[in-house]
Amino acid sequence: MNRLIVVLLTSFLIFGCSSNPTPVAPVIEKFEATKYLGKWYEIVRLPHSFEEGLQRVTAEYRLNDDGTIEVTNRGYNIELGEWETAIGHAKPVGTAMYKVTFFWPFYGGYYISELQTNDAGDYSIAVITSDSYDYFWVLSRTPKVPENVLDEIMKKAESWGYDTSLMIRVNHQAGYQ
């Protein structure tokens, strides 16, 4: 029994923490990390336990001296009536490809599959995918995205194999503190 546990744990560490990225959707080829830094609003996501019940979710990215990125996710828990914050780190593994951890040694793939820019050339909307169809986010520099833009993103998500009927629209209306 102990031997089985050691084999399973070793397998998990080898395969679960692998540095080989395996995105399920295309990843953009041109990307400037410094233009991605700063605050983003979560607009759409797939459901998962670590964001359950959260609204007004934001992510803030800061560059560390070693080239990694500090990630601060913040959301308002409606049931508890309080803000929740999680701080993680992202390591670049390729162009627009990161391994993100909020609980070492467990990493998840974070791949930028689409970036839209505003008239000034700044990144304004990002579509984030992962190693599985369980994770998908639409982020924006503003709390609102035009419906026609979201419709186009959802069409792309479906073409990549995502079930868009499961996606959650994040509420950013005032009144949650």
Feature annotation, model-predicted:
Residues C17-Q177:
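A beta-rich soluble binding module of mature secreted/lumenal proteins
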Residues M1-L4:
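Positively charged n-region of N-terminal signal peptides that target proteins for export
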Residues V6-I14:
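Bacterial N-terminal signal peptides
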